[in-house]
Amino acid sequence: MNWFFTLASIVIVLDQLTKKIAVMILKEKESVTLIPDWLKFTYAENNGIAFGMEFAPKEVMILLVGTISLLIALYVFRSKNRTTRFILPFALVFGGGVGNMIDRITGGKVIDFIHIDLYNGMIMGTWVSLWPIFNIADSAITIGACLLILFHSTIFPDQSVQKNTDVH
């Protein structure tokens, strides 16, 4: 369990620190280009969830994310699985969720600043930006979710297979 909270704390600290730096350096600027036509830092405030979609009022989002985070921590705590493949994804999702929840509680919105500029332009007469501006917490949640999918069979072994092998 210490490994879980250590990893989650690292995500939260990195997320909050980079957001503070983004506010200090980027808030008054348009963007800072790191790799032309690909990667830049652009300050943005997000009232919604993924891709800026507004899902619910701030208070509901805080309650929802807080509940999900608590359930993740309880699930990890109650599980006997202490492998890296189990702990790492859940710690990333938990840390990312808490990092963004801190923003919602303290400022009412999430600070985003990493901008992968894949394509901005017209598609079928509509202006689109094909990649959202995001932050460290969003990255941790996404990576954690991908790891859960990737390692699903080792994290959650099929119980019916175990029961069948126990009978023989």
From Swiss-Prot:
GO biological process, one term: proteolysis
InterPro entries, A to Z: Peptidase_A8 (IPR001872)
Name of one Pfam family that matches: Peptidase_A8
Any one GO molecular function term: aspartic-type endopeptidase activity
GO cellular component: plasma membrane
Top EC class for this record: hydrolase
Predominant subcellular localization, coarse grouping: membrane
Catalytic reaction list: Release of signal peptides from bacterial membrane prolipoproteins. Hydrolyzes -Xaa-Yaa-Zaa-|-(S,diacylglyceryl)Cys-, in which Xaa is hydrophobic (preferably Leu), and Yaa (Ala or Ser) and Zaa (Gly or Ala) have small, neutral side chains
Ranges annotated as spanning the membrane: 57-77, 86-106, 131-151
Keyword Signal: no
Annotated metabolic or biological route of this protein: Protein modification; lipoprotein biosynthesis (signal peptide cleavage)
Membrane topology qualifier: Multi-pass membrane protein
Location within or outside the cell: Cell inner membrane
Disulfide bridges in this chain: none
Active site annotation, chain numbering: 112, 138
Protein task: This protein specifically catalyzes the removal of signal peptides from prolipoproteins.
PANTHER family: LIPOPROTEIN SIGNAL PEPTIDASE (PTHR33695:SF1)
Descriptive protein name: Lipoprotein signal peptidase
Organism field: Chlorobium phaeobacteroides (strain DSM 266 / SMG 266 / 2430)
Organism ancestry: Bacteria, Pseudomonadati, Chlorobiota, Chlorobiia, Chlorobiales
